[in-house]
Amino acid sequence: MSRSLKKGPFVDGYLLKKAETTRSSGRKEVIKMWSRRSTILPQFVGLTFGVHNGKKHVPVLVTEDMVGHKFGEFSPTRTYFGHTSDKKAKKG
């Protein structure tokens, strides 16, 4: 179920402040963040965010196609190593 239009998109307040200061300073730096639940807004386009995946910060460069999605969608939390093969079956 999607969020009510009356409420608007959710973005943590500190994230808006950090993005505004980074854009006004003109520096190209990665903005570290832990808020995977925040929605990507149009004013974030062109900025790079380090989205935490539980272990490290994954750099995500925001493009226009990402607007409206959540930051957590672009930083996977689980690593898939594939199913291990059965060594007994290979022998025989």
UniProtKB/Swiss-Prot annotation:
Gene3D superfamilies: 30s Ribosomal Protein S19, Chain A. One of its GO terms (cellular component) is cytoplasm. It comes from the Bacteria. Belongs to the universal ribosomal protein uS19 family. HAMAP family: Ribosomal_uS19 (MF_00531). PANTHER family: RIBOSOMAL PROTEIN S19P FAMILY MEMBER (PTHR11880), SMALL RIBOSOMAL SUBUNIT PROTEIN US19M (PTHR11880:SF8). This is Small ribosomal subunit protein uS19. The gene is rpsS.
